[in-house]
C-alpha cells in the first residue's frame, strides 16, 4: 500500500509529539496531522460512499470530530483511530443520504491523489502504458464495491484497501472477530464474481488465477 511521504515521515519521526501538541490546542500541529492523513481518510470515505462530494463531507467531519475527541485518544495506532472516526462519519453520511436522496457522482482521480486498490488486484508489473487500463479498473472496483451491502463494503475497504488487520477492523466497527472474518470472506467472493464481468481489465495474474480455479 502506498502512503504519502509526509505520512511516512510523521509516523517515523514525530507523530506522538504532534498529537500531544494538538491535544493542548496547537492548531499547527493538528493541521500537520491533517495534511499527513487527508488522502487516506478521503480515499476510505470515497470507497465506502462511492460519491466524491459525500466523501469530502465525511473527511471534513472526520477531522472536526477527531480534533474534538483528541483527549479520548489513549495511544496505539493513530491511523486506526482515524479510520474508526471516518467509518463512523461515513455511516452518518449514509443515514443522511437515506433521508434526502442525492444524485450519485462518479468518483474520479483528476487531482492525481492515490487511489488504493485491494491487494488481491495489485499488479506489480504495471507500466506507464497501463495507466488507462488502471483507471478503468478503478471504476470497475468501485462499481463492485457499490454493489456490496454497506457492512460488507466497510470490511473490504478497511482490511483489503487500507490494510488493517482483523482485530483492528473488529475494534473499528465493534463486531466480533468471527463476524469480521465471515463478512470479509463473503465480500471477497462477491467482489471476485462481480469483477469477472470486467474480466478484460483485470491484471493478468488475477485472470490466470481464475482460470486455474483458485
Where are these regions (language model features)?
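Acidic, proline/glycine-rich intrinsically disordered inter-domain spacer in sigma factors
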Residues: 9, 112-143
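Helix-turn-helix DNA-binding module
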Residues: 13, 139-154, 158-179
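Sigma70-family region 2
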Residues: 23-24, 47-50, 61-78, 96-98
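Amphipathic, Lys/Arg- and hydrophobic-enriched alpha-helical face
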Residues: 34-52, 69, 145, 151, ...
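Hydrophobic-face residues of short alpha-helical interaction/recognition segments
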Residues: 41, 45, 70, 82, ...
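Arg/Lys-rich amphipathic alpha helix in sigma70-family domain 2
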Residues: 72, 87-105, 197
Amino acid at each position: 500500500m502506498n502512503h504519502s511521504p509526509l505520512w511516512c515521515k510523521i509516523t517515523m519521526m514525530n507523530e506522538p509529539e504532534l498529537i500531544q501538541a494538538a491535544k493542548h490546542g496547537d492548531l499547527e500541529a493538528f493541521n500537520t496531522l491533517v495534511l499527513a492523513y487527508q488522502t487516506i481518510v478521503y480515499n476510505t470515505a470515497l470507497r465506502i460512499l462511492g460519491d466524491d462530494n459525500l466523501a469530502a463531507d465525511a473527511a471534513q467531519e472526520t477531522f472536526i470530530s477527531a480534533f474534538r475527541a483528541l483527549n479520548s485518544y489513549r495511544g496505539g495506532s493513530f491511523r486506526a483511530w482515524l479510520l474508526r472516526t471516518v467509518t463512523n462519519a461515513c455511516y452518518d453520511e449514509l443515514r443522511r443520504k437515506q433521508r434526502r436522496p442525492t444524485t450519485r457522482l462518479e468518483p474520479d482521480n483528476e487531482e492525481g491523489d492515490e487511489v488504493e486498490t485491494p491487494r488481491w488486484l495489485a499488479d506489480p508489473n504495471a507500466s506507464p502504458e497501463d495507466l488507462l487500463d488502471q483507471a478503468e479498473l478503478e471504476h470497475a472496483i468501485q462499481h463492485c464495491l457499490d454493489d456490496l451491502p454497506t457492512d460488507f463494503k466497510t470490511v473490504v475497504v478497511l482490511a483489503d484497501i487500507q490494510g488493517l488487520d482483523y482485530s483492528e477492523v473488529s475494534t473499528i466497527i465493534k463486531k466480533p472477530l468471527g463476524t469480521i472474518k465471515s463478512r470479509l470472506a463473503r465480500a471477497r467472493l462477491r467482489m471476485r464474481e462481480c469483477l469477472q464481468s470486467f474480466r478484460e481489465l483485470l491484471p493478468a495474474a488475477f485472470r490466470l488465477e481464475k482460470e486455474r480455479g483458485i
